[in-house]
């Protein structure tokens, strides 16, 4: 039975919303607004035509992680061109800004859009980057991108994604990711692509240790990731926890998503507090807001009410998230006067804050309207 701490008052909620923070674990396709999913779907006469947002909210109830992964593909189906990617990025930034998010690294499964619908890489990244530029101008949120490979696809496809990451570095791409169903598909299957990208300066930030155990985390650590998506099942093996500590790896933990997909049966069983107490670096992420009903702030609330985090812990977690941002994501981004972030610890290069102008090299965005596809 989950323990519940009362006291999430409006004052505390407002305080946490005001903490400058980074969102480092959110999937673009899983962060569409329900109305946008329906709008894009109706445009193409898709599977949700004629259904409303209430039905959509009730629709996504998952039997297990694999069931979730199957339903997730629904969210990728509605993207048809660069304008759809731009719209999704702009709207996500609009949703993140009131939650105190000043910087976001957003994961996009570009390889899925390419394989399933034939979208060229340049159209995908043009839409993402146009959205990032509009988001900066409109919401003040700095958005960068992780292009993830899907484990069900081949090692050759992963190499293609790695090549795209290198090509996209000047247009907001900061890392290679790895997602999808973990069991039987460890990170080491994609070693060639990961190492090829690393040789060209692209870091690897895979999901590991969510649907698979501590061994998946150990396997991923072979590639020296600065962060791991989820990773909390490292707690099953003290030696793996020690490895996280030795390397300073940050875990992007998403409590609501872990509960919804059934990888934890009850938040009281979630090991994130134990890991943090051991000294493991932890940040919180909303993962897939559309599918889980999560936000950046709900994860902070879950941590407070169910995972034993104090208000001071939440503030420290917000600071940690800024310090865990990837260096490539923040050139030209400056400290806001009066802010005491990011922390100087962990070798964070330079000051990071809100960019005061569109990033150097940003493309003109007037040709991509966020309201309709072209």
Q: What residues fall within each predicted segment?
A:
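Metal-cofactor-binding active-site regions of metalloenzymes
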Residues: 1-202, 211-216, 222-227, 232-250, ...
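Conserved hydrophobic beta-strand within the GNAT/NAT acetyltransferase core sheet
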Residues: 204-206
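Compositionally biased, low-complexity intrinsically disordered regions
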Residues: 349, 360-363
């Amino acid at each position: 039975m989950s323990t519940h701490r009362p006291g999430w008052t409006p004052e505390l909620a407002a305080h946490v919303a005001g903490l400058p923070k980074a969102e480092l674990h959110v999937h673009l396709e899983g962060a569409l607004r329900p109305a946008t999913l329906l709008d894009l779907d109706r445009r193409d006469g898709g599977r949700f035509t004629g259904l409303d947002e209430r039905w959509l909210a009730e629709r996504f109830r998952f039997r297990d992680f694999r069931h979730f992964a199957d339903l997730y593909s629904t969210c990728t189906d509605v993207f048809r061109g660069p304008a759809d990617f731009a719209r999704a990025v702009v709207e996500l930034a609009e949703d993140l800004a009131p939650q105190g998010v000043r910087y976001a690294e957003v994961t996009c499964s570009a390889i899925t859009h390419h394989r399933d619908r034939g979208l060229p890489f340049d159209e995908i990244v043009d839409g993402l980057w146009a959205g990032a530029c509009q988001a900066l101008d409109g919401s003040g949120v700095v958005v960068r991108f992780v292009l993830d490979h899907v484990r069900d696809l081949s090692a050759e496809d992963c190499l293609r994604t790695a090549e795209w990451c290198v090509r996209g570095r000047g247009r907001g791409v900061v890392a290679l990711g790895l997602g999808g169903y973990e069991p039987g598909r460890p990170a080491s299957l994609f070693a060639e692509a990961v190492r090829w990208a690393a040789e060209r300066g692209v870091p690897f930030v895979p999901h590991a240790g969510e649907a698979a155990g501590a061994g998946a985390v150990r396997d991923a650590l072979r590639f020296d990731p600065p962060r791991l998506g989820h990773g909390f099942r490292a707690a099953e093996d003290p030696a793996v926890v020690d490895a996280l500590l030795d390397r300073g790896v940050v875990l992007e933990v998403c409590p609501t998503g872990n509960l919804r997909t059934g990888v934890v049966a009850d938040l009281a069983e979630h090991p994130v507090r134990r890991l943090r107490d051991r000294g493991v670096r932890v940040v919180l992420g909303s993962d897939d807001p559309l599918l889980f009903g999560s936000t950046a702030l709900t994860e902070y609330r879950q941590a407070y009410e169910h995972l034993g985090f104090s208000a001071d812990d939440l503030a420290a977690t917000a600071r940690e998230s800024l310090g865990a941002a990837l260096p490539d994501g923040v050139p030209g981004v400056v400290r806001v006067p009066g802010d005491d972030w990011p922390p100087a610890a962990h070798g964070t290069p330079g000051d990071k804050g809100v960019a005061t102008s569109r990033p150097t090299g940003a493309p003109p965005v007037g040709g991509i309207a966020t309201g309709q596809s072209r």
